[in-house]
């Protein structure tokens, strides 16, 4: 539970904004603001999956339709038929390509690194119990605690024109990370130096425009397969979870009427996820401004917004957290 969201300048750690979270989110949104490590979230979700209904190591190669069902095909020759097939197969979705044809992703010119710093073994007196956003020219760094405060998660994004692979699992090194942030504040450099050398990964950030439709016949998309988004609003996993909840409610409401189910699902989810996609794209431009004049205007805008509404969550992002997926049946 972070105390606040804090914006800092890349070179002198000067404050850009301070948004209280722990003290304000329950009153504003009826819930706490949590940080969770992705692996822990996966483990929690996996607890509710029945092993007898799960097949692993099955590579989907496509989806086709008959009159009343969708049929998924797999690399081993097996097929799977269902009233509804949901492609939740990520940014390189085979199901999306089968439904709508291949769509090449656009490389944004940004590289992202992720790393973990073990706080138990290496105390970090300079790291506050906040979510910290260090904003600099052509890059930014985000830090926040995970694993009950025993580790600090570090996400660093910088401009880089030389990336071509859309992958989350490419290993990197401390030196490569340090080289991407010359002249940054000593606290950031120290974090990079303390990172677990076996846990530093990098990936290129690829973008796609919002889709006009997700569903066709008896198949649809969910999560990154439907709306891959840049990480500048930290909403990728949240949007996928919301998708899943709304789709389940639509199925409960309309039963085997797959047409009405998918119509309700898209009507509820597509406007919201498209807005998040586009706002995340614009947020990246704001974070990575480089000219002195741009930085001055941006920082003045941060301060003005802070004075106007000290309890604002994030930077004009209240609308992200005000949404309540559990009320979706009222809108079907």
Give a label for each model feature.
Residues 1-8, 106, 126, 194:
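A short alpha-helix-loop-beta-strand transition element characteristic
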Residues 14-42, 69, 75-80, 116-202:
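Conserved FAD/dinucleotide-binding core of flavoprotein oxidoreductases
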Residues 1-48, 286-287, 294, 301:
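Active-site-adjacent segment of FAD-dependent monooxygenases/related oxidoreductases
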Residues 87-101, 119:
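Flavin (primarily FAD) binding-site architecture
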Residues 51, 97-112:
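Glycine-rich beta-alpha-beta "Rossmann" dinucleotide-binding loop(s) and their flanking helix/strand
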Residues 38, 65, 82-84, 88-93, ...:
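Glycine-/small-residue-rich beta->alpha transition segments that form the dinucleotide
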Residues 56-70:
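A conserved short coil-to-beta-strand element within the FAD-binding core of flavoproteins
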Residues 86-87, 91, 113, 143, ...:
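Conserved mid-domain beta->alpha element of the FAD-binding
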């Amino acid at each position: 539970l972070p105390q606040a969201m804090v914006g800092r300048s890349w070179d002198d750690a000067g404050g850009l904004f301070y948004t209280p979270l722990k003290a304000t989110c329950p009153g504003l949104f009826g819930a706490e603001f949590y940080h969770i490590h992705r692996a822990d979230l996966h483990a929690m979700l996996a607890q509710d999956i029945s092993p007898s209904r799960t097949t692993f190591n099955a590579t989907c190669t496509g989806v086709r339709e008959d009159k009343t069902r969708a049929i998924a095909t797999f690399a081993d020759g097996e097929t799977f038929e269902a009233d509804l097939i949901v492609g939740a197969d990520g940014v390189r979705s085979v199901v999306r390509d089968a439904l709508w044809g291949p769509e090449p992703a656009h490389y944004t010119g940004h590289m992202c690194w992720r790393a973990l710093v073990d706080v138990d073994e290496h105390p970090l007196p300079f790291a506050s119990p906040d979510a910290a956003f260090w904003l600099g020219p052509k890059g930014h760094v985000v830090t926040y605690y995970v694993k009950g405060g025993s580790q600090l998660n570090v996400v660093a994004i910088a401009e880089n024109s030389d990336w071509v692979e859309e992958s989350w699992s490419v290993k990197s090194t401390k030196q490569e990370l340090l080289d991407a942030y010359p002249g940054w504040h000593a606290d950031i450099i120290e974090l990079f130096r303390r990172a677990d050398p076996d846990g530093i990964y990098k990936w290129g950030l690829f973008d796609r425009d919002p889709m006009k439709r997700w569903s066709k016949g008896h198949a649809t998309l969910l999560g990154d397969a439907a709306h891959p988004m840049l990480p500048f609003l930290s909403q990728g996993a949240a949007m996928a979870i919301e998708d899943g909840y709304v789709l389940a409610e639509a199925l409960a409401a309309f039963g085997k009427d797959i047409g009405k189910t998918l119509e309700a699902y898209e009507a509820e989810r597509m406007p919201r996820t498209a807005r998040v996609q586009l706002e995340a794209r614009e947020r990246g431009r704001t974070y990575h401004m480089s000219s002195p004049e741009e930085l001055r205007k941006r920082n003045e805008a941060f301060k003005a917004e802070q004075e106007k509404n000290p309890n604002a969550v994030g930077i004009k992002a209240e609308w992200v957290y005000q949404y309540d997926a559990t009320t979706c049946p009222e809108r079907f």
